[in-house]
């Protein structure tokens, strides 16, 4: 079963993206490099609760 998670920019904290995460990988937090409109650059986005 997959769970819906929100990704927030590490620099500004803006919640820009949502994605689905496998329940098998729930122990570790997701970390993805994506584009942030507020920072106007590609930054690391972290999974939020």
Swiss-Prot record:
Recorded GO CC terms: cytoplasm; ribonucleoprotein complex; ribosome
Organism, scientific name: Bacillus licheniformis
Similarity comment: family membership: Belongs to the bacterial ribosomal protein bL33 family.
UniProt xrefs under InterPro entries: Ribosomal_bL33 (IPR001705), Ribosomal_bL33_CS (IPR018264), Ribosomal_bL33_sf (IPR038584), Ribosomal_zn-bd (IPR011332)
Keyword Transcription: no
Taxonomic superkingdom: Bacteria
A GO BP entry: translation
Record-linked Pfam families: Ribosomal_L33
Keywords per UniProt: Ribonucleoprotein, Ribosomal protein
GO MF annotations in UniProt: structural constituent of ribosome
Name this protein carries in UniProt: Large ribosomal subunit protein bL33B
